[in-house]
Amino acid sequence: GQLNEFFKALQDATTTPSQTTPRSVVLAKASTLASTFHQINADLTETRRAISVQIGVTISETNGLTRTIAELNGKIKSAEISGQNANDLRDQRDLAINQLATRVDVSTLERSDGTVSVFTARGLVLVEQETTRNLIGVESSDNQGLLDIGYDIGGTKPSIISDFISSGKLRGLLDVRDGTI
């Protein structure tokens, strides 16, 4: 390809250093190669930005699923307190938990009141009874403004947990975006 052409032109120029044509060819090949590298860099930057957008979408989906699980927890708890069968609600909640697990690594703990607590694999609470903790897309100052994954700790600044997500769609997106090519 272009790299081989550049090195061949460079070799030709070194064998005939007094001739201007081979030197001109080296400059032309170097310019073409530099333009190609600039285009590749622009394409990679755009791909990283597009993946960062997908991270934001997946964070929103994750938060929607945790809200669904919390709402179903409340309905299950109410149904079972009043003696009603909550199996359909439990099935819906299980489906939401399974969908959540495709996005981020989670573990669950069923409580005696019929609710399920959902945690990240590192133990951060995502759902506790009818309450949720959100993931937040945080623009990174040291990663070209791309999104990191934050955990809403209730303060002014979320805790960055990107490195603590070990599986699921979010981990895959982070790995592709931040991996070495």
How would you describe each model-predicted region?
Residues 1-16, 22-76, 89-104, 163-181:
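Amphipathic, non-membrane alpha-helical segments that mediate helix-helix packing
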Residues 68-71, 77-181:
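Phosphate-proximal small/polar/acidic motifs at interfaces that engage nucleotide phosphates
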